[in-house]
Amino acid sequence: MSIPNNLRYSEEHEWVKTEGNEVVIGITHFAQNELGDIVFVELPEVGATIEADEPFGSVESVKTVSELYAPVSGKVVAVNEELSDQPELVNESPYEGAWMVKVELSDASQVEKLLTAEKYAEMTNQD
C-alpha cells in the first residue's frame, strides 16, 4: 500500500496535504481498504468550522459507517463535490481524486504534530 511521503497523517487514518495556509484532507489507502467499497460520503458545508479530533463527516461502506475525524482545526473553504455522485473515488484514488475538504488553518502548528509517512507506516505495520 502506498503512503506518500509529502503528506502528514492522523492516527484516525486521515491524510493532510499542506498548501500555504490551507490543507487538503482525505482518508488513507489503509482506511479505504479496511472499509471496503465506499457507497456514500457525508461532508461539511463550505464555511463550516471544524475542530481537531472532532468528527466532521462520515464515510459509509458496504461493511460499516465510519466517522471522519478532523486532523486539524479551521474553516472549510472547499468540499469535493464529486464524492456525492462518485463515492467509489475514495477506493480508486484516495490521495488524488478523492480529497474530501480543503481547510483554512486556524493553527498551522497542528500539522507538525501529525505523523510522518514513516511513523504512519509503523503504526499500520506497512513498513
From Swiss-Prot:
InterPro entries according to UniProt: 2-oxoA_DH_lipoyl-BS, Biotin_lipoyl, GCV_H, GCV_H/Fam206, GCV_H_sub, Single_hybrid_motif
- Sites where N6-lipoyllysine occurs are at K63
Q: Name one GO biological process term.
A: glycine decarboxylation via glycine cleavage system
CDD domains in alphabetical order: GCS_H
* Cited HAMAP family: GcvH
Q: Subunit notes for this chain?
A: The glycine cleavage system is composed of four proteins: P, T, L and H.
Q: What does this protein do?
A: The glycine cleavage system catalyzes the degradation of glycine. The H protein shuttles the methylamine group of glycine from the P protein to the T protein.
The protein's name: Glycine cleavage system H protein
